[in-house]
Amino acid sequence: MTSEATLEKSRQMYEKAKTLIPGGVSSPVRAIKPYPFYTASANGSKIKDLDGNEYIDYCLAYGPALLGHNHPVIKEAIKAQLDKGWLYGTPTELEVNLAEKIAGYYPSIDMLRFVSTGTESTMSALRLARGFTGRNKFIKIEGGFHGAHDAVLVKAGSGATTLGEPDSLGIPADFTKYTLQAPYNDIEAMTGLVEKNRDELAAVIIEPVLGNIGPITPLPGYLEELRKLTLENDVLLIFDEVITGFRLAMGGAQEYFGIVPDMTTLGKIVGGGLPIGVFGGKREIMEMISPSGPVYQAGTFSGSPCSIAAGIAVLDYLEQEKIHEKVNSKGDYIRAVLTEIVEDEGIDYSVCGIASMFKIFFGAEPHNYQEALKCDKEGYLAFFHRMLASGIFLPPSQFETNFVSAAHSEEDIEKTLKAYTENL
């Protein structure tokens, strides 16, 4: 159990942090009101703060920790690479090996490029799509989150929506005029937008499952119709699988739903918890990237040996242990029990999610961004604090997904469900 008194060290650290770091945090989603707890360590399914409080963690660093925190296989791979050096500025065999593994699971990827973040992956993918097609416009989904670069910070999910600022100052209007938006799960609206702009349209970029505004899952047939629409209109389809990649299945949402896009972005899990991003696609598209072609992309830390080594380790482990069925069944079980709890309590909440992703939404089940905005954000925040006091760490935003890991035990899950029953 925690209380205001037991978070004193975190409160003091927050007061100091505010004088040195804007908002006291390095990413807005971490700005828990009235102040966040500061982490001292994490292991398995647990995370511990400066005051020694331990929590069962369903935030999991916002998705990367599919195996749980501090996994020994990943840790040993990083240690082994550190002994050889951690930054060279040259190509490595590791990059080739990881690229081959990834391409083997994603039929949309003939070739790929490593970068350092998910933001870089989507930024580079969109630049490449424009360079390949010679067109400037692209469509994103309302509430879709594709990182923090200028082109996509329009009605963005994640921390932007949590703070009530889904758009950002500092982005010229002339720049975002090329960013079009369509509501999720509305193929008619998407069709109209694509057909109206097809001669100027480079790509549609979409999170197959909206992970930063729910999660919100696709209605039956939506992704299939979107794939058909983009093919018929000669528009590239980009799947942003930074969250869903290697989480829903080894082949991500593409395997789970049976859809093959033209380009794919990855991150989070594929780096084993170290900074990484990936963008890949069909050979004729990817060969437009420098030095093979005229679309420029570069980065000092791209293909960082430690990140690549961690990525190989986590994919090897996933291949050997075949954990997805087990982890996804944990998610299925949690959602089923939460649905029973909500029904028994007679409250107007909904249970959302897929595979190892889940959430209780403080309102009716949303199918798009506008419906998600109708939720009770303040009610969720109060609930978050009650759960934290019960030793359960959920994402502090109503719009961020809860994740289950391979490390969560039956005891962890039952304790969590008991806390839900007591705190809703």
UniProtKB/Swiss-Prot annotation:
GO annotation, biological process: protoporphyrinogen IX biosynthetic process
GO CC, any one term: cytoplasm
Keyword Isomerase among UniProt keywords: yes
Annotated localization: Cytoplasm
Subcellular location, principal: cytoplasm
Pfam families: Aminotran_3 (PF00202)
Residues annotated with N6-(pyridoxal phosphate)lysine modification: K268
Catalytic activity annotation: (S)-4-amino-5-oxopentanoate = 5-aminolevulinate
EC number: 5.4.3.8
Family indicated by similarity: Belongs to the class-III pyridoxal-phosphate-dependent aminotransferase family. HemL subfamily.
Protein name: Glutamate-1-semialdehyde 2,1-aminomutase
Gene (UniProt): hemL
